[in-house]
Amino acid sequence: MEKRTTYCGNVSAEFIEKEVVLKGWVQKRRDLGGVIFIDLRDREGIVQVVFNPEKSKEAWEIADKCRSEYVIEVKGQVVYRDKEAINPKMKTGEFEVMATDITILNTAKTTPFTIEDDNNVNDELRMKYRYLDLRRPSMTNNIKLRHQVTKTIRHYLDNHDFLDIETPYLGKSTPEGARDYLVPSRVHAGHFYALPQSPQLFKQLLMGAGFDRYYQIVRCFRDEDLRGDRQPEFTQIDIETTFLTPEEIQTYTENMLAEVMKETKGIEISVPFPRMSYDEAMARYGSDKPDTRFAMELIDVAEVVKDVDFKVFQAALENGGHVKALNAKGAADKYSRKDMDNLGKYVSQFGAKGLAWLKVEEDGLKGPIAKFLTEVSDELIAATNAEVGDILMFGADKPEIVAAALGAVRTRLGKELGLIDESKFNFLWIVDWPLFEYDEEAGRYVSAHHPFTQPKAEDVDRLATDPASVYAEAYDVVLNGYELGGGSLRIHTRELQEKMFETLGFTKEEAQDQFGFLLDALDYGFPPHGGIALGLDRLAMLLAGEENIREVIAFPKNGKAIDPMNNAPSLVSPLQLFELNIDVTAIDE
């Protein structure tokens, strides 16, 4: 084999009248009037190669044997195409290579699907033949984009004195958060390592060790139910610092993201990002990760409807709940009664009992609940800024149910009504988070982020007496309705960390058993510290304009956490189980 001159997709005017050696895959072969044209593809793109029997009979005869996905090496001269043959849709559309020599490096069977973007192949088949799927230009470009993101991040953090430090994959299982993936120890029978859900404690210990600024682009593992933007193994951009305020950590983060946007998309974004408290986000958008690319907001109408004779509204208000509305401007004729019934069923997954609604017509409000609101119709129209052609949708229940239901409806309407400007990248900080959430099923408070989050100084005294009122030095960065990442200042004294564990229901013995190494470390002069972790997969997905992180991961799992290509997970041999002292008692095939 001869040395390659350049990539197929990089053939340009620089190579005119020069001889080049190209290597790649046959995208397409055409025989036109005795002249063979091959579209030769590699990771950088496609170039047209011409085989004229008058130029080289031997090369023409070999080219005639080529079929799609054959791997070939071509030598020839780069020339300009005739004007009528220029293809403006191709990066190399002005040029072609007049071949003088060709070598078939490997043949290929007929592929189970065509190697092109618009092939309408189901996801399971794509994943079974992932190595073929990755040859498609869109997938190749997604993986290259991901590389550009990580390259830019490393460059930025290196330039700001962050150290890239690896942390262990084999660690200790802890009860907080999602389920762990466990790894049995052969040497220590009955004992298990856990694959890390994040390097949280290790990066805190690195701060205690004095490294000051740490980062790692690190693989993490969570055994949880999957959805479009989640995988059992995923990649975090993990950052930790000492002696910085939340605002300083946020500044580093947003400047890093601005650099990523500039390098990958050629877009200059404004910094600092807007900031919004958690309470404000929930009140205005019904979401802690609002999509601010469109303006529809939740409207509190409790004062307007507090005296109406509608039991649903009254019951909610009497029990300390909320009554809120959404105004879908100009959407009345787009949603039938059946559509509204379907929306009512949709919100049931968020705990709502239904979705009340009204349409604004020339002669007033019309709909299933209009008769209950006759006396306040003018006030309701004013409060919601309603006009003829609008449709009002109402949630009445516990505050968290109203927020979740209407927030989800808002997001759905934004997509269905085409309200979202897909060209926008709206970044946002959500700050001032509650430190705890109440788990109804467990009957106790759990960490809203993780148990190492620093409470706001003014709230510490209420940790034991009123946990629900305690706020955290925590912050999430949001992009277009997706949580990109979250961070916080961390607890750096043993006394406060023990109080935190106590509030979460740990006994002293449990805390020492599970987190004793951290508690002991806090006795040795731990500095104030904090950081953030960002989802690389999700960031790459949004930059690529995809809707599923599988599209930016080279070898992902499917919705059942299975790799259809290599059939992982799989059964293992009895000998392997015996060596690990594991007895599998029952398998549901």
UniProtKB/Swiss-Prot annotation:
PROSITE patterns: AA_TRNA_LIGASE_II. ATP binds at residues 222-224, 231, 483, 535-538. GO terms for molecular function: aspartate-tRNA ligase activity; ATP binding; catalytic activity, acting on a protein; nucleic acid binding; transferase activity. CDD domains: AspRS_core, EcAspRS_like_N. Residues 200-203 are annotated as: Aspartate. It catalyses: tRNA(Asp) + L-aspartate + ATP = L-aspartyl-tRNA(Asp) + AMP + diphosphate. GO terms for cellular component: cytoplasm. NCBIfam families: aspS_bact (TIGR00459), PRK00476.1 (NF001750). Belongs to the class-II aminoacyl-tRNA synthetase family. Type 1 subfamily. This is Aspartate--tRNA ligase. The gene is aspS.
